[in-house]
C-alpha cells in the first residue's frame, strides 16, 4: 500500500512526495547485475570474484568496511553487499549492457548515457525513485511466483504499479520464451 502525504500543513511538508523523488540507488542495483550475469551464463553463484585493492582508470572503489576479503564467491559478495567485487563484475558485463537491463526494468530516472554513470552506477552513482525500484522488484517477484506455479512466463509480466484497482491487469499470453532477465536467478 502507498500511504503518505497525509493532509497536513506546509510546515510538515505534505507537498513532498519522497516516494517519487529520485535518490541515490546505493547498492540496490547489485541484485539486478547479479541476476543479469547469471541469466547470461557469465557468472555462477560460487564463482570467485576479487575483493582486493582496486584502481580502474583512476576509480578506486572501497567497501563500506574499508577492508578486503580476497577471493569471495559471487553469492557471498551479494549477501555482504561488497562493493569492489561488483565493480569488477560490472566492468566485465559493461555499463552499456547493464544500462539496457535497467531500462528493461523501467527505472526511468536512470536516463543518461551509460558513460555518464560509469562503473559507479553499481554503487549509487545513479538516481532512481522508490516507486520504480519497488515496481522492478515486484515484477521480478511476480515472474518467479508465476513460473514456479505454472512453468511458463507471461509476455507482459512487467506492469506499472497503480494507485487504484480500476481495471484488470493484462499480463499477455503464456510463453516458454525466456524473459530478458529471469528473476529466478536471484
Tell me what each language-model feature is:
Residues 46, 110-121, 147-154:
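Surface-exposed patches in mature extracellular/periplasmic domains of secreted proteins
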Residues 6-10, 24, 54-56, 83-85, ...:
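Solvent-exposed loop/turn segments at secondary-structure junctions
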Residues 60-63, 94-135:
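Mid-domain, small-residue-enriched loop/turn segments at the edges of structured enzyme/sensor domains
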Residues 21-26, 69-70, 74, 78, ...:
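Secondary-structure capping and boundary motifs in well-ordered enzyme cores
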Residues 43-98, 142, 161-186:
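Conserved catalytic neighborhood of penicillin-recognizing serine enzymes
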Amino acid at each position: 500500500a502507498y500511504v503518505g502525504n497525509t493532509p497536513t500543513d506546509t510546515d510538515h511538508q505534505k507537498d513532498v512526495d519522497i516516494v517519487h523523488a529520485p535518490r541515490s540507488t546505493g547498492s540496490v542495483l547489485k541484485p539486478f547485475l547479479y541476476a543479469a550475469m547469471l541469466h547470461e551464463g557469465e557468472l555462477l553463484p560460487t564463482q570467485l570474484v576479487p575483493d582486493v585493492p582496486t584502481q580502474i582508470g583512476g576509480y578506486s572503489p572501497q567497501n563500506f568496511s574499508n577492508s578486503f576479503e580476497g577471493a569471495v564467491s559471487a553469492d557471498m559478495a551479494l549477501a555482504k553487499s561488497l562493493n569492489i567485487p561488483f565493480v569488477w563484475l560490472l566492468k566485465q558485463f559493461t555499463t552499456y549492457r547493464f544500462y539496457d537491463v535497467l531500462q528493461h526494468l523501467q527505472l526511468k530516472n536512470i536516463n543518461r548515457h551509460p558513460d555518464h554513470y560509469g562503473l559507479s552506477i553499481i554503487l549509487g552513482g545513479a538516481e532512481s525513485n522508490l516507486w520504480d525500484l519497488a515496481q522492478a522488484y515486484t515484477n521480478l517477484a511476480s515472474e518467479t511466483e508465476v513460473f514456479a506455479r505454472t512453468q511458463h512466463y507471461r509476455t507482459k509480466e512487467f506492469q506499472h504499479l497503480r494507485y487504484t484497482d480500476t481495471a484488470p491487469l493484462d499480463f499477455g499470453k503464456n510463453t516458454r520464451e525466456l524473459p530478458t532477465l529471469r528473476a529466478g536467478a536471484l
